[in-house]
């Protein structure tokens, strides 16, 4: 049984080779915008930036509304934590 398994392992047919690409690459049909992928990537980055900005605004709004967080910020200001720093970063 072991001998049969070993012979099957080593005598198994090799997998088919991967298909080769054409040397010229893929030919796009007429009328396709070549910058379409670049525009899509830029749009994606803009969406991510907008989401990041919205989350930061929500965080700042939550800090202003929540009384516990507002009290903590007041105590930190009294202790002088924000003297040399920009308070908007926190």
UniProtKB/Swiss-Prot annotation:
Residues 33-66 form a coiled coil. Residues 1-26 are annotated as: Disordered. It comes from the Eukaryota. Keywords: Coiled coil. This is Uncharacterized protein DDB_G0289137.
């Amino acid at each position: 049984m072991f001998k049969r398994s070993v012979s099957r392992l080593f005598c198994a047919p090799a997998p088919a080779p991967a298909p080769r690409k054409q040397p010229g690459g893929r030919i796009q049909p007429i009328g396709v915008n070549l910058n379409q992928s670049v525009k899509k990537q830029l749009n994606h980055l803009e969406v991510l930036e907008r989401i990041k900005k919205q989350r930061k605004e929500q965080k700042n709004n939550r800090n202003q509304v929540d009384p516990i967080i507002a009290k903590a910020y007041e105590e930190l200001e009294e202790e002088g934590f924000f003297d040399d720093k920009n308070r908007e970063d926190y």
